[in-house]
């Protein structure tokens, strides 16, 4: 109240993280509290974690809500980029007892790979933890895509796709070797990760901010 009295109502900001949507009390009553603050500055994980998925889904599938949800109970290869569901309980893929479900992938012969600059709780139980240089996730992804095209590992004949050749052309110069220098992941690791993902029967890539 003192800050707002001296600097105006909008001098106070509110940030709501992912756990907010896992708490019924916050979901049903937080708006009353926020209304009392009378600030227009409301922030959440949505701007960095959620909205990019909606935009991508709109561009790829025609609607912002057509976001693919990982089938954690049936996949045999799960690649997690930046996500830490053991701490956040997942986002989009919110499931009870997520640790048990991730370990079930391993028990049925599958593989869990986590890409994260730090050894998160989820990375600690993964079959493979790939340390990536902070801020260089895009370089790693470009290296993976380049390998998929370079080694003819794409299988899109059963899907209605468009402009795949444009993607292939755009990614042509982003070799695993070139991207390794950017992201800090060895080129051999990038290539093997792409091969493992492509060769799995039911692979899924899950990317979040936490």
Language-model segments: what does each one mean?
Residues 1-210:
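Cofactor-pocket helix-loop regions in the catalytic cores of large enzyme subunits
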